[in-house]
């Protein structure tokens, strides 16, 4: 409106507006701009519009720009090209050593919830890290889902190790066994069973510790705590805060994660930075974070079942690059 001569203002004010926020004292310039905008708001909204001045049509303008100009799709960034060969071999050898350490620590052929639980969680974490290292998931949304699983495994192991109580170890095992029985019973009476479920295998697992008919099936968290409180009790709230919230979005389909993995922004300024589909957006690699948490789980194994020294070498690949 100033440039069209419809509103007059002192030259110094015009210069401050045109060079905002790089000129003048902002404690004075900002209030002046706000007051000026409020003074002309009625003209723009129509309550005091001069005769012959057309009503603004912002939506029609943006609609025309969308219909008459093409989207500009940004070039997709390539995924990290950093080799993970050394890390992969280190995970493989460490996993092998971990399994050997388990065999050396078998004390009974009866149920041992402490050894099975601790080693099982750690072995599961390293197995998931291995899957990341041999697949494209390292740079995609599925890798974040795996990382989230590793985070929960680690917090659970740390909580169990800190308490180190036979009753709590058994509580963890019984809850998981009951959930297996529940899954079997639900699918037994279902009209259609998912192709990914092997009912014969599921039945064996459901009856492994005891007949499923004799098992208690609990609901909720096995420790009667949510994961955040479990992390606080285990003194690993730093892990929860750093990893859990964002990675959980990919598991639950939260908008932020969906937006990050499925869309990009149109670079045409006349399109107001709207979203356009871009499935398979490459993302920062997750393998290093997976390995860090795996090594922290191995620290717990070393304390529960001394001594265990092997660790995953995740730094050598980065050093080569």
Predicted regions and their residues:
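Secondary-shell segments that build the walls of catalytic and ion/ligand-binding clefts
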Residues: 1-107, 173-321
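Amphipathic alpha-helical scaffolding segments
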Residues: 145-153, 169, 264-269
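Active-site catalytic microenvironments for nucleophilic, acid-base chemistry
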Residues: 157-160, 300
């Amino acid at each position: 409106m100033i440039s069209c001569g419809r509103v007059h203002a002192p030259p110094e004010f015009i210069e401050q507006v045109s060079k905002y926020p790089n000129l003048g004292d902002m404690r004075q310039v900002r209030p002046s701009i706000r007051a000026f905008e409020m003074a002309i708001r009625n003209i723009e909204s129509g309550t005091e519009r001069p005769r012959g001045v057309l009503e603004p049509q912002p939506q029609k303008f943006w609609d025309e720009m969308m219909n008459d100009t093409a989207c500009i799709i940004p070039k997709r960034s390539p995924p990290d090209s950093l080799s993970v060969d050394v890390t992969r071999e280190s995970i493989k050898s460490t996993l092998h050593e971990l399994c050997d350490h388990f065999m050396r620590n078998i004390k009974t052929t009866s149920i041992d919830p402490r050894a099975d639980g601790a080693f099982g969680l750690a072995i599961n974490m390293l197995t998931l890290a291995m899957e990341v290292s041999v697949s494209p998931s390292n740079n995609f949304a599925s890798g974040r889902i795996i990382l989230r699983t590793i985070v929960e495994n680690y917090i659970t192991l740390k909580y169990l190790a800190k308490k180190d109580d036979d009753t709590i170890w058994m509580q963890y095992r019984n809850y998981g066994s009951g959930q297996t029985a529940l899954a079997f019973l639900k699918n037994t009476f279902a009209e259609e069973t998912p192709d990914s479920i092997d009912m014969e295998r599921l039945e064996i697992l459901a009856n492994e510790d005891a007949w499923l008919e004799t098992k208690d099936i609990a609901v909720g968290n096995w420790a009667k705590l949510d994961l955040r409180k479990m992390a606080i009790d285990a003194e690993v709230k730093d892990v929860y805060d750093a990893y859990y919230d964002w990675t959980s979005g990919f598991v639950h389909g939260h908008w932020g994660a969906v937006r990050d993995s499925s869309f990009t922004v149109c670079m045409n300024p006349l399109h107001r930075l709207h979203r356009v589909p871009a499935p398979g957006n490459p993302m920062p690699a997750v393998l290093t974070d997976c390995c860090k948490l795996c090594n922290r789980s191995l620290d717990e194994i070393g304390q529960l079942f001394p001594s265990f020294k092997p660790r995953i070498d995740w730094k050598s690949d980065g050093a080569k690059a």
